[in-house]
């Protein structure tokens, strides 16, 4: 590949677990533990949503699986974050190629949605 050629970025993949979380009726710490088992060890952005579908928080990670599982350990979280986790009914994920892509996407999504816990 020459300098003039840039590697193509694959499309951002959005994984939505809302249908699954409705069927198994998990919320908060339990849904986070359940979902984290299926996440890739890749950079990306994650969204936590409430029962009503409101976005509570948007964050980025260089490793989605490792970052998201941290929310399942409530003892290590502030009360504010514990509250956010308890309100979480579903999560959405955007897998990116690089941390820089994740950072840019996170910034754009936060500006657009203005989540309560950001």
Model-derived features with residue positions:
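Acidic, glycine-enriched active-site microenvironments
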Residues: 2-118
